């Protein structure tokens, strides 16, 4: 991670966004030549974390644990678990987020204190991504009357703020449990005329046309060859803007992901795919879109690249 980024920048001006982030977190990486100053959480903490969660380490600690990757076979473990629920990644993700994953992530995305320190940190990171997304969407225009597709809406953490700003929101998720939770929360916070339209659906099956399509922290479930097609599909639904967030692929993050796979648990049936910004930009370019704004959210245990794309 050879950077200490601001949370949001644009291709035209970086500084214009910085005053809007008084609490922006800058992530400074410990040089490899120094002893580790960022230590992994306890195994007790990590046991409750998904394969999408990476234990952040430094220096020799990373090298030592990275060597352990060859002693385990997380891919074989995932394959066996996948066979139990019918095969491919989509079925695994659907099953996971309708069962143990739903309970875990409902706590992380909620306000309960029944989470460990790693999960609290992830909660903070995802909340920052939602905040930064809302800033991208409202920086230079009102959302009143704007049609927005929230693809992979989870428990409604973005859908509800969008509706509060006057957007006409269509929200979907592969998990029926997540959609039910999002709908319940929306009804408690919004008047009936402003409620998003919720549906259970996977990304591949989404149809329609929207001013803006948003897909946050979902591409982590897609390998790059499938992510290219998914990005193209999402762009085909959008008229003006596409906003995506994804776990950035770097050598350091890739090692940390592999370390995270060493810790057993039911969530390891779900694969966690990292994506390079260049690959995402290339996929957008192939279908006539270009990146207009870029952002990055980082906490100790959460990192997510955020981009806004517009037609060329």
From Swiss-Prot:
One GO MF term: magnesium protoporphyrin IX methyltransferase activity
Pathways per UniProt: Porphyrin-containing compound metabolism; chlorophyll biosynthesis
UniProt cross-references to Pfam families, sorted A to Z: Mg-por_mtran_C (PF07109)
InterPro entries linked: Mg_prot_MeTrfase, Mg_prot_MeTrfase_C, SAM-dependent_MTases_sf
Upregulation: Up-regulated by light. Down-regulated by the herbicide R-imazethapyr.
Catalytic activity: Mg-protoporphyrin IX + S-adenosyl-L-methionine = Mg-protoporphyrin IX 13-monomethyl ester + S-adenosyl-L-homocysteine
Stretch forming the transit peptide: 1-39
Regulation: Regulated by the folate status via an increased concentration of S-adenosyl-homocysteine (AdoHcy), a potent inhibitor of most AdoMet-dependent methyltransferases.
Subcellular location: Plastid, Chloroplast membrane; Plastid, Chloroplast thylakoid membrane
Major subcellular site: plastid
Deletion consequences: Lethal under normal growth conditions and stunted albino plants unable to produce seeds when grown in presence of sucrose.
EC number: 2.1.1.11
Recorded GO CC terms: chloroplast; chloroplast envelope; chloroplast membrane; chloroplast thylakoid; chloroplast thylakoid membrane; cytosol
CDD domains in UniProt: AdoMet_MTases
Membrane topology: Peripheral membrane protein
Any GO BP: methylation
Keyword annotations of the record: Chlorophyll biosynthesis, Chloroplast, Membrane, Methyltransferase, Plastid, S-adenosyl-L-methionine, Thylakoid, Transferase, Transit peptide
Family that this chain belongs to: Belongs to the class I-like SAM-binding methyltransferase superfamily. Magnesium protoporphyrin O-methyltransferase family.
PANTHER family named among the record's database cross-references: METHYLTRANSFERASE, UBIQUINONE BIOSYNTHESIS O-METHYLTRANSFERASE, MITOCHONDRIAL
Role this protein plays: Converts Mg-protoporphyrin IX to Mg-protoporphyrin IX methylester using S-adenosyl-L-methionine as a cofactor. Involved in chloroplast-to-nucleus signaling by acting as a negative effector of nuclear photosynthetic gene expression.
Record's protein name: Magnesium protoporphyrin IX methyltransferase, chloroplastic
Protein's organism: Arabidopsis thaliana (Mouse-ear cress)
Lineage: Eukaryota, Viridiplantae, Streptophyta, Embryophyta, Tracheophyta
